[in-house]
């Protein structure tokens, strides 16, 4: 859905339409795929064998770091999970070295070659789904027997098509797409946490 598609004469109208579109786009999420992702992450966060690797560009790079931070800290605190989550954008020095010595298209693929193994999970966050480094990472991960997941927006691009599981935001607005991707990160971590806590514990802690 295209938003905005007109000029607004006051903040109130834009505010109301923004949140209307935000909620509409979140309601378009494929809940069956979300359940699959939660099941996969629950398994790797408890098996002590595999890791989650996350990546993105620009605002999605920030979401990648946020994903790693929240899932490692929030879920480990329950003592029920041992999440091993790596954001491929966290090591700025390594990223610039690969970009300079190889190329930016390979910034994620080169790191995957070094740290990934079979049945690790690659989760890419990309509004367009067409960033070349994201697409290359997905192709390499699929070829090397990783589990691949994509968070996308707009028309989903290539990442929507080639990831084994996709969560797509029906929107053509970067802000709305990225806000909903952040919501998905929170939903996944908080739901996993809720599943292992008692009602008494839930009432005592902050989410």
Residue ranges of model-derived segments:
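Glycine-rich, small/polar surface segments that engage phosphate groups of diverse ligands
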Residues: 43-115
